[in-house]
């Protein structure tokens, strides 16, 4: 059990409560004074900072306002399409905002700092008066409580005495008469005891009444103390301090809002005017003031004194006409070749821009350098192409058949670009070099070729050739499901590469995008309209046959080496990007095809040795997955021969159309009967497996032949689905097939 609470005297308890009240009121007063002081000092320091900042801004803006900018005239100061007036307006607006901040510093001093000091001084004086008055009121209440305690004490004493007399009287009344007491003595004692009891009861009643009256008075006094006197003291102590604090807080917020409003009004106006600044108007002003940038007069022909001619001249059947035709052929070829260079460099530029963010600063710098080189190559090619087109335009004005040469050259370039789409695209190698960044070398080689091509006299040849030059890209019009092992299943809208004609009519051999080869119906395909220059090569049959013999022998060696040495070749596909940590490790992107050279090593640390993009190194085997036999190109029906160490990735570029009209020439064709042609290089053979252009190398592609065990179809091709099956069933013929 806990001991009963200790009884404290009422007067002592009252003094403790009143002392605590006095302490709390003084603490409240001190907190309010501290708040006033904080507001006062904060406003002073903020005003000083604002003033210093505003003066610094004014000094900064004034320095720039002293400069004389070009293009600012007195009558053009409100023309905000020029950047110089807007800039000057911005500086002037900054000066105005800085001046408004200085004015705000005065508001801090006038509305917060000085009034807060006066309010605090007044509050200190009010505290002293309130403390004296509260002490007096508390003393009066203490006296009242003391009287209450005295009345209570007197009441307890008289009541206890009366209680004792009453008990004694009751005892006497109940006691029996003894043998030695007389009745008279007993009566006297009883009368005396009753008189004393009556007197004690009267005193007790009087003391009780006094105590109750004093208690009522003390309670009334206490109620007034808490309800009136103490409230008045606290009200007097507070005074108007809360009104002043509210005014100061409002002044802080209003001042900031006025500052923000002034800044917003100024810079909103400047923002609207800044949006009117346009480059074209500023450039126009600059050009008006600087006549040196005006386009000069075109260069004029300055004839010799004895020369009376002012333009190109052509005489029918003369050497000059032949020379002009050769010039037209030369520059048409140059236009086509530069168009091809632009396409190549644009492809390289797109690949470089999609390369992603380089990890190191050095790699980033190298990547930016490659991008700049590609853009520079495009710029040079465009200039050369423009100059060649200007020459062709002048030749066309005198009747030279420019369009014929340009159309033939562009068709040849379009064929080459279309065939190159199936080759390995240009890519960045491990050492940062680019396979296709050789436009300058190609251009130099082309110029040397143009200088030497005058030895061929082919001005009477014709560009009207309709023979197909395989390999050729085509589009599937109707789906077809293979019914024989040597046929190929195709889907509608699929893009195929036709390799060669079939032995039977209406059949061709084609390769799909995954490398599968087989025979498909020719009428199920849509071939591009090609105006190639195959007929031009007929005049170079001797040179072509020599080049063809050399190229065939080289390809035979490559095929033999592939069959004998790469029978167990294995490829894997990268599942993630990997950056080599050392010089002997191989780096590759996600989806890369890597040729495996060795899976076993002495450490057995999970690293394989492989080749990617011409570089050999080791890499973690957990980052790749092995390709199946069909993916490796080793299906039993096709026996594809893989010469490149990695399969050609699928390019997302759309098929390039073959031009029926020159894409960049605005000239209409004058007369196609008088067309003349430009011969291809003797190294380009119409039956070659490679589609190469001067200075541009692409991956080699081998065409499967019947010598490797493929059976050519000896059956009629099915008609397209849109045609009626009007053909009758043809009799199967026995054909003797000889495997070589």
Curated annotation (Swiss-Prot):
| Signal peptide bounds | none
**Matching InterPro entries:** AH/BAR_dom_sf, F_BAR, FCH_dom, FCHSD2_F-BAR_dom, FCHSD2_SH3_2, FCHSD_SH3_1, SH3-like_dom_sf, SH3_domain
Fill in the PTM field for this protein: Phosphorylated. Phosphorylation on a Ser residue is important for recruitment to the cell membrane and for its role in promoting endocytosis.
Q: Where is the SH3 domain?
A: 469-530, 567-629
Which of UniProt's keywords are assigned here?
Cell junction, Cell membrane, Cell projection, Coated pit, Coiled coil, Cytoplasm, Endocytosis, Lipid-binding, Membrane, Phosphoprotein, Protein transport, Repeat, SH3 domain, Transport
| One Gene Ontology biological process | positive regulation of actin filament polymerization
> What SUPFAM superfamilies is this protein classified in?
BAR/IMD domain-like, SH3-domain
The F-BAR domain is annotated at 8-282
Which residues fall in a compositionally biased region of kind Polar residues? 629-645, 675-706
Q: Which GO terms describe its molecular function?
A: phosphatidylinositol-3,4,5-trisphosphate binding; phosphatidylinositol-3,4-bisphosphate binding
- SMART domains membership: FCH, SH3
Name the CDD domains for this protein: F-BAR_FCHSD2, SH3_FCHSD2_2, SH3_FCHSD_1
Show the segment(s) annotated as Disordered: 303-323, 629-740
Basic and acidic residues: bias regions: 307-323
Compositional bias (Pro residues) spans?
646-657
Give the principal location in a single coarse category. cytoplasm
Where is coiled-coil annotated?
356-397
Per UniProt, subcellular location reads as: Cytoplasm; Cell junction; Membrane, Clathrin-coated pit; Cell membrane
Q: Which cysteines are cross-linked by disulfides? A: none
Record note on domains: The F-BAR domain has an atypical, flat shape and binds preferentially to flat membranes. Upon heterologous expression, the isolated F-BAR domain is localized at the cell membrane, and causes the formation of cellular protrusions.
Q: What does this protein do?
A: Adapter protein that plays a role in endocytosis via clathrin-coated pits. Contributes to the internalization of cell surface receptors, such as integrin ITGB1 and transferrin receptor. Promotes endocytosis of EGFR in cancer cells, and thereby contributes to the down-regulation of EGFR signaling. Recruited to clathrin-coated pits during a mid-to-late stage of assembly, where it is required for normal progress from U-shaped intermediate stage pits to terminal, omega-shaped pits. Binds to membranes enriched in phosphatidylinositol 3,4-bisphosphate or phosphatidylinositol 3,4,5-trisphosphate.
Record protein name field: F-BAR and double SH3 domains protein 2
What is the gene called?
Fchsd2
């Amino acid at each position: 059990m806990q001991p009963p609470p200790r009884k404290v005297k009422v007067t002592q308890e009252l003094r403790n409560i009143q002392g605590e009240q006095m302490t709390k009121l003084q603490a409240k007063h001190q907190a309010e004074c501290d708040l006033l002081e904080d507001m006062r000092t904060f406003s002073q320091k903020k005003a000083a900072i604002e003033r210093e900042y505003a003066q610094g801004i004014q000094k900064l803006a004034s320095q720039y306002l002293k400069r004389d900018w070009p293009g600012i005239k007195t009558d053009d100061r409100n023309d905000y399409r020029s950047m110089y007036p807007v800039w000057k307006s911005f500086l002037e607006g900054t000066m105005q905002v800085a001046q408004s901040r200085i004015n705000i510093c005065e508001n801090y001093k006038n509305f917060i700092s000085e009034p807060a000091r006066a309010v605090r001084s007044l509050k200190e004086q009010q505290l002293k008066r309130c403390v004296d008055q509260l002490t007096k009121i508390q003393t009066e209440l203490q006296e009242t409580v003391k009287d209450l305690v005295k009345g209570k004490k007197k009441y307890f004493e008289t009541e206890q005495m009366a209680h004792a007399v009453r008990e004694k009287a009751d005892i006497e009344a109940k006691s029996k008469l003894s043998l030695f007491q007389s009745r008279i003595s007993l009566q006297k004692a009883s009368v005396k005891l009753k008189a004393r009891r009556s007197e004690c009861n009267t005193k007790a009643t009087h003391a009780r009444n006094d105590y109750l009256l004093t208690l009522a008075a003390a309670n009334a006094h206490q109620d007034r103390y808490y309800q009136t006197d103490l409230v008045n003291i606290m009200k007097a102590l507070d005074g108007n301090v809360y009104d002043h604090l509210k005014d100061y807080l409002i002044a802080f917020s209003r001042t900031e809002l006025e500052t923000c409003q002034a800044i917003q009004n100024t810079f909103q106006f400047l923002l609207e005017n800044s949006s009117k600044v346009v480059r074209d108007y500023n450039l126009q002003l600059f050009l008006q003031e600087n006549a040196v940038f005006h386009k000069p007069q075109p260069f004029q022909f300055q004839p010799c004194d004895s020369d009376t001619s002012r333009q190109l001249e052509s005489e029918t059947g003369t050497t000059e006409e032949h020379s002009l035709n050769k010039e037209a052929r030369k520059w048409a070829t140059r236009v086509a070749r530069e168009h091809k260079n632009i396409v190549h460099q644009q492809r390289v530029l797109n690949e470089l821009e999609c390369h992603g963010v380089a990890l190191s600063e050095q790699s980033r710098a190298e990547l930016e350098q490659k991008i700049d080189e590609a853009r520079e190559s495009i710029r040079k090619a465009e200039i050369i192409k423009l100059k060649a087109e200007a020459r062709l335009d002048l030749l066309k004005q005198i009747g030279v058949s420019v369009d014929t040469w340009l159309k033939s050259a562009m068709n040849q370039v379009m064929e080459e670009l279309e065939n190159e789409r199936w080759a390995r695209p240009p890519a960045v190698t491990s050492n940062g070099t680019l396979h296709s960044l050789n436009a300058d070398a190609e251009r130099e080689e082309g110029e040397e070729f143009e200088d030497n091509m005058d030895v061929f006299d082919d001005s009477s040849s014709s560009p009207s050739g309709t023979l197909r030059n395989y390999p050729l890209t085509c589009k599937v019009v109707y789906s077809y499901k293979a019914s024989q092992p040597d046929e190929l299943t195709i889907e509608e809208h699929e893009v195929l590469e036709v390799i060669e004609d079939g032995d039977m009519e209406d059949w061709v051999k084609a390769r799909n995008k995954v490398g599968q080869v087989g025979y498909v119906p020719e009428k199920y395909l849509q071939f591009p309209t090609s105006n190639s220059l195959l007929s031009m090569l007929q005049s170079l049959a001797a040179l072509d046959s020599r080049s063809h013999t050399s190229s065939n022998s080289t390809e035979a060696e490559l095929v033999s080496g592939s069959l004998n040495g790469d029978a167990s070749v294995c490829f894997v596909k990268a599942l993630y990007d990997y950056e080599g940590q050392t010089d002997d490790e191989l780096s590759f992107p996600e989806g890369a095809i890597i040729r495996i050279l060795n899976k076993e090593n002495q450490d057995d640390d999970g690293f394989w040795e492989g080749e990617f993009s011409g570089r050999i190194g080791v890499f973690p085997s957990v980052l790749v997955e092995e390709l199946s036999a069909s993916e490796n190109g080793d299906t039993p029906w096709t026996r594809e021969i893989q010469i490149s160490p990695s399969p050609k990735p699928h390019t997302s570029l759309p098929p390039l159309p073959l031009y029926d009209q020159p894409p960049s020439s605005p000239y209409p064709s004058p007369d196609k009967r008088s067309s003349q042609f430009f011969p291809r290089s003797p190294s380009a053979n119409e039956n070659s497996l490679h589609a190469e252009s001067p200075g541009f190398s692409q991956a080699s592609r081998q065409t499967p032949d019947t010598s490797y065990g493929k059976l050519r179809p000896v059956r009629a091709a099915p008609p397209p689905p849109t045609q009626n099956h009007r053909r009758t069933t043809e009799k199967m013929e026995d054909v003797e097939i000889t495997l070589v």
